[in-house]
Amino acid sequence: MYIVNEEDKEYRFGDSGPKYLMKGPRMNFALVQFQAGQDFKAHYHNVMEENFYILEGEVDIVVDGVVNHLRPGQMIHIEPGEIHYVINNSGAPMKMISTL
């Protein structure tokens, strides 16, 4: 058991990208932030499922070519092998939780 303070962690790309609060052998938990217009390249996972839960702002998550526009309170589940791409097409920052 352990406790993590978000303030002790940093976003991968300065003010954006994933901020991993926990990386383990069976699961990762991250706070993800994108500024307006920022994106994360298309990719997939061979074994892991990924979930995104939107906390603030709006984001487009493209899964196998289908655009899913998500708002706070919505979650998307991505299966292994599904190619996904994340882009903040809004004019404001967005924040979401990622479990992987």
Walk through the language-model features, giving the residues of each.
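Histidine-centered metal-chelating micro-motifs
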Residues: 39-41, 60, 76, 80-86
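Glycine- and acidic-residue-biased ligand/ion/polar-headgroup-sensing regions
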Residues: 47-49, 53-59, 64
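A short, N-terminal "cap"/entry segment at the start of jelly-roll beta-barrel domains
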Residues: 1-28, 41
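Short acidic-glycine-tyrosine-enriched beta hairpin
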Residues: 65-80
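Short strand-connecting beta-turns/loops that link adjacent beta-strands
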Residues: 26-27, 47, 91-92
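Well-ordered beta-strand scaffold positions
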Residues: 25-27, 58, 66
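Conserved short histidine dyad/triad with adjacent acidic residue
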Residues: 30-45
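Ligand-binding loop in jelly-roll beta-barrel domains
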Residues: 80-100
